[in-house]
Design a protein with these regions (language model features):
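Conserved alpha/beta enzyme-core scaffold
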Residues: 1-231
Length: 231
């Protein structure tokens, strides 16, 4: 089945206000840049975005925060985005903060059809407030629910028209598991190749998980925090 779509704008034509979107990426690495830009252009609002972090003020999810298109963020680290901090402090943005390992497992569980699981991480802290706790073998555990989305936006290095994807190094991050945990998965790739060009043993996301794929453009290597030393 040919899953190619001509552009990011065409790929999100069914995205509606109030949707929950899983967005791959770690820092500024492996984020679906073209899809985020398309959402900004389309103006879709009241979104719940599930992503490791919220980008920076002028890039990534930060572009959607500027337009007040995001209602709620489910994240692990948001310290690089000043606007994010301001919106949360003013009560204009809901935040569900997760330990990073718990965040990853919640998405994996959602993709595996597991509704909830117990973890010791976060017990006795603010992330456990309002959640069921239980003791197992003398240890206290917190109940966490699996995460699923209406959409998942993933960014891959290479892909083919059937939706098979290969990620590159750190850019893999949360993308593969997010591709399993949404009703509709859109992949943007740096290079769209012909069938047979991808080594099956190196495919990270099988095409069965992907609904639409397109070749992105204008990718820019961003550095989130530059550290230099005088020698």
């Amino acid at each position: 089945m040919d899953k190619r779509i001509p552009s990011a704008d065409a790929a999100i034509r069914n995205l509606r206000d109030g949707a929950t979107i899983l967005m791959g990426g770690f820092g500024l690495c492996g984020i679906p840049e073209n899809l985020i830009a398309a959402v900004r252009r389309q103006g879709t609002k009241d979104l719940t975005v599930v992503s490791n972090n919220a980008g920076v003020d002028e890039f990534g999810i930060g572009l959607l925060l500027q337009q007040r298109q995001v209602k709620k963020m489910v994240s692990t680290y948001v310290g690089e985005n000043k606007l994010f901090e301001q919106l949360v402090a003013r009560g204009e943005l809901q935040l569900e903060l997760n330990p990073q390992g718990t965040f990853a497992e919640r998405i994996r569980a959602g993709g595996a059809g597991i509704p909830a699981f117990f973890t010791p991480t976060g017990y006795g802290t603010m992330v456990a407030e309002g959640k069921e706790t239980r003791e197992f073998d003398g240890w206290q555990y917190v109940l966490e629910r699996g995460i699923r989305g209406d959409f998942a936006f993933v960014k891959a290095w290479k892909g083919d028209r059937w939706g098979n994807l290969i990620y590159r190094k750190t850019a893999r991050n949360f993308n593969p598991m997010m591709a399993t945990a949404a009703d509709y998965v859109i992949a943007e790739v740096e290079e769209l190749v012909e069938l047979g060009e991808l080594d099956p043993d190196k495919v990270h996301t099988p095409g069965i998980y992907v609904n639409a794929i397109f070749q992105g453009q204008g990718y820019e290597k961003r550095i989130e925090r530059r550290t230099t030393a005088r020698i």
